[in-house]
Amino acid sequence: EIINPILPCKMEGYNEARFCFNQTAQQKQVSGEGLRTACGLRDDLLLDTLILQAGETMVFFTLDIAIAEQRFTDACRKAVSEACGLDVSHICVSCSHTHNSPVVSHGMNGELDPDLEYWERIQDKMIYSAKWALRHLREAQATLDQVTINGFYNNRNRPGEEYNDRCEILTLRTADGLPLVQLLNLACHPTILGAQNLYITADFFGVLRRSV
């Protein structure tokens, strides 16, 4: 599901004053200290939904947003649980941590005001995608692998510094061995575009998703 915001909008990810070097005085006056205002869309923000059923039903949502804080995820899980009849404890909400999403959290110190209308739009998308996935469940075989990746990412834009190079890959295939979906777990601070970027984007993980 595409979860692009209505533009223009405030951007989360580089709201500390030390990240304001790219903004003019006029931009700072319009958007507030440290908060960028998105002037366009570089690529789509997505909501990915995976439902696994083996005796019990587990739902995994991954959002292209900066932070999935508890206040937000609790509201989303409750909405999906009530709409789909699912156990709220079996609903997981995570994020890709792009630093170029709309403001969806209250910030590290409660200094931000999240876009509550955007929250509601995401909840509606979650409900729709969960209902669709429940109607289209397929038999699948699961394999779990771990690989080492070098040269494609690290922790922020710091080449040569230590980082976790392990990636776990959960692959679901049909009985004929055809791939259905892959779920990747890796440690990466996706800040490739940096604070100078004024476009909404999924950043590194958007490119990774399109390439896998």
Regions inferred by a protein language model and the residue ranges of each:
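Conserved beta-alpha junction segments in alpha/beta enzyme cores
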Residues: 1-94, 102-212
